[in-house]
Amino acid sequence: MSKTYLGVDIGGTAVKLGLVDENGRVLRRAERSVSFDGYKTPILDTVQTAIREFLTADAPRLEGIAVSATGQIDSRRGVVAGTCGNFPGWIGVDIKGTLERAFGLPVTVANDANCMLLGEVWAGAAKGYTDVIGVTLGTGVGGGILTGGRLLEGARGLGGELGHFRLHALDGVACTCGAIGCYERYAATTALVRSAQKAGLDAPDGRAIFEAAAAGDARTLAVLNGWINEIAQGLAGLVHIFNPQLILIGGGVSAQQALLIDPLAAQVRKSIMPAFAEGLEVRAAALQNDAGLVGAVYYFKQQQ
């Protein structure tokens, strides 16, 4: 009989749930807001309620609960070690212990960007690759690094926090983490919107910017290319450290092949030494909203 796992993807505004089989297929899905009352209800309380409602009487026997979670996750203990977002009461939450006591099942917890990468490695655009840098572009920048077929986690499972290496340390923009010049302040889609508005463009969001760029607006294209260059410079440094086969771009903007992925690939190759460019691929993630669920389950399977 096929094994089934419960994947739980806890984000800043919603929790996604999915029954995932042993081949990485999502059999059933659900989603619930975690910010519906301004976080007055603790996030993990909302998650537990969502799980109980999701696991109906006819649900299959589960091997365990695999959690992908926003924030700096101590994956060794399954605890939230830190966060740069405005999530009241999230730091210090024992996700693993709480869910194991509540549901009587083994639980693993990993960072959401790491899970995105693992999902793509198991069942998506990075399948078959052993050395991959995964970057998720959104309101911030998340990242994961696969080297020699293994996820780079570090001593406490906190490794791969790509959004907070210092791209412009001396004269950069202040970051929510308290530092200056962090990568996500230049590479996130919010940075693109900020740059467009600073240039006097009508740019309420990233979608509007890409629509204007697709229409050939020269000022918008100049802002977009500047943003792509910032992303590329950060990736170039990572390429020289990790020598990946593949750079994987996730987030909603990754669907912009002609306006983002193709020019980004070209700019990265121009910014690195020739030996590192040989065979290097840059492509969009494939699993979209399922990546965190699938990757969390893959992480669970690896820990057993």
Locate the predicted segments by residue.
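ATP-binding/phosphotransfer module of carbohydrate and carboxylate kinases, centering on a glycine-rich
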Residues: 1-64, 74-79, 97-105, 119-129, ...
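Short, flexible active-site-adjacent loop segments at beta-strand->alpha-helix junctions, enriched
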Residues: 71-73, 86, 113, 157, ...
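Glycine-rich phosphate-binding loop of actin/hexokinase-like ATP-binding domains
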Residues: 127-186
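A charged helix-plus-loop insertion that forms the helical arch/lid used to bind
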Residues: 78-92
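A short acidic/small-residue loop/turn micro-motif
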Residues: 33-36, 88, 159-161
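Active-site nucleophile and cofactor-binding loops and adjacent substrate-binding regions
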Residues: 85-88, 108-114, 134-137, 283-289
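Short beta-strand segments
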Residues: 9, 66-70, 110, 134-140, ...
